[in-house]
């Protein structure tokens, strides 16, 4: 995981290929993690690979209805800020409290909406009825703001737009600036 930052830095300094394995971007809403990501020379995939066959990817929502995209929800509720956990903060050398303070201040420049803060918490506090997708629906969330969390991918797959402030796997489907929090990006549903 991200705790191997020093090993990754050595590999990069020596121009060695490495593979990073961590929790997958979707389908992990229960106690058991069914999906993982394997990334070459990075900790996240940065761009979709349209050159690869999509047959396996298309089979996933057929077997797991919880991750089937059902269209965009256009809710008029609060903004959900999903804070980065200690691992990405350490890896990217950011201070979580400073990030939260600056992010909230920036959001308030562009909206009067209520802001709900969600910290990562223990795994048992993040699955089932307590998962991000459940909160998005139950709290009628307008938009998610996060650093580079899997929460951006979960939001999009639930039909809620996301603002992801650092590079990550959901970049092609996210707004990248808080200034657009009131009118976030709703990509074409075919993407």
Language model features with spans:
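Leloir-type glycosyltransferase catalytic cores
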Residues: 30-76, 172-191
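Short, solvent-exposed loop/turn segments at secondary-structure junctions
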Residues: 2-4, 24-27, 84-88, 121-124, ...
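Short amphipathic alpha-helical segments
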Residues: 8-12, 93-94, 156-158
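A structural signal for short, well-ordered beta-strand segments and their strand-loop junctions
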Residues: 1, 9-12, 17-24, 80-82, ...
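Charged, low-complexity C-terminal accessory regions
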Residues: 5-6, 146-191
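Active-site and donor-binding regions of nucleotide-sugar-utilizing enzymes
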Residues: 1-43, 131-135, 151-152
């Amino acid at each position: 995981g991200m705790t191997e930052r020093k090993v990754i830095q050595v590999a990069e300094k020596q121009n060695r290929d490495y593979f990073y394995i961590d929790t997958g971007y979707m389908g992990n809403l229960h106690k058991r993690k069914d999906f993982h990501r394997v990334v070459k020379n990075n900790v996240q995939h940065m761009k979709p690979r349209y050159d690869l066959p999509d047959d396996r990817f298309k089979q996933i929502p057929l077997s797991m209805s919880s991750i089937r995209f059902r269209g965009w929800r256009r809710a008029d509720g609060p903004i959900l800020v999903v804070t980065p956990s200690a691992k990405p903060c350490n890896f990217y050398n950011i201070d979580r409290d400073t990030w939260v303070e600056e992010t909230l201040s920036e959001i308030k420049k562009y909206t009067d909406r209520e802001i709900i803060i969600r910290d990562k918490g223990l795994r048992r506090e993040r699955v089932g009825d307590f998962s991000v997708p459940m909160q998005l629906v139950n709290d009628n969330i307008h938009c998610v703001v996060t650093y580079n969390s899997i929460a951006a991918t979960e939001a999009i797959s639930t039909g809620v737009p996301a603002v992801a402030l650092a590079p990550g796997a959901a970049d092609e489907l996210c707004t990248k600036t808080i200034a657009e929090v009131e009118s976030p990006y709703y990509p074409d549903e075919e993407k």
